[in-house]
Amino acid sequence: MDGSCNKKHPVLAVVGPTASGKTALGVALAEQFGGEIISADSMQIYKGLDVGTAKVTPEETRGIPHHGVDILQPDEPFSVADFTALAGALEHEISGRGHLPILVGGTGLYVQSFLYGVRFAAEKTPDGLREQLAAELTQKGPEAMYAELQAVDPEAAVAIHPNNHVRVLRALEHYRATGKKLSEQKADSLPPEKPYRSLILGLDFPERAQLYCRIDLRVDQMMEQDLLNEAKRVWEHRDTYKTAAQAIGYKEFFPYFAGESALAPCVEKLKQASRNYAKRQLTWFRHMEGICWLDASAPDVREQAARLTNEFLAKG
């Protein structure tokens, strides 16, 4: 792999909704093409959040290096700007070793910002704005705050879960502080050309019911893998684990821990939240240009992905 300054490094990305088989495909391609994985998942960066984030297990890695996993404690903040900087450094190291960087994950904003080379300018939050937004959240409620975000920046609202209060407030904070949408900032900060030569493989199913069945099965497996105890740790530290406390896979069990609900309805709520999240992921990726979509249920999906990857690398 050419590491010269004048030639763009090739980067492969495997994207798609939750439970679509991204991890297994990414590992298979890494084995075949000498790759290393960069996780593009906003929650797998955190230590100890393993079951609820469907973090790759040592057995599933098959010896392939995985980067961007288990780096931070759950009480440490991590933004898309942080990810873009981290992924850029990892890409440089992996390409420098003569290996193929393979971005694997379902956080569309991370994938797009990295592959498109978005530059994030530091912005100073006006004094008192963050506290004001927090007070408004308490007074008006999360539905009103999300409705405001939908009104001022509908593109950002599509990418953010209505119950992810942290991200909703951050997006509103950016808008009120700068007068610009996050989506506008992203467009304004795009470089003249993309920094990498990339192939993006997307996984989806012909029938949405196939994906939903896989999601339901995954949740059942998570329950067998002691998700409840992991969620309880997040509940016990919810005042400091602010990002995790808003994450799908954990917050659905809070009513159970508070003695306000039986367990079974919480499990069903998690399945529904995961299905809704998958729909939002697909909406995001369908708006991204240049994705080569593959039928995740096809028996030869790995062969199709390998053929496309081989053709992509041959063009370099």
Q: Where do the language-model regions lie?
A:
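Phosphate/pyrophosphate-binding catalytic cores of soluble transferases and nucleic-acid-acting enzymes
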Residues: M1-G316
